[in-house]
Amino acid sequence: MFKVGDILTYAFQYSARHPHFVRVVRVTPKSIAVEKLENKVVSHDGYGQNGYVVPNLENPGKLIEGTFRVQESKYFGEYCKISGCYATLWNGTPEEFYTD
């Protein structure tokens, strides 16, 4: 089960990829509450269209209203759906973003 302080990542993706990060702020037996964190660009192509981001842990996040049910998948383990995307535990490496 996720724990308070865990960082999760999810991305909107079709012809572009826009990663997002959230931090777990409350845990119940079957759900979590999260706050949305700002992205911090760590590298880009010079135009800001392609690159890598990490969560900005220096600024406080913004609480997302409601709770999210935690589920289990044999493919990628524990997750919850946020804004229609699968949020999973962030592995600590920068996430790629790009636009077409």
Describe these PLM feature segments.
Residues 1-21, 31-100:
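Mixed-charge, low-complexity intrinsically disordered regions
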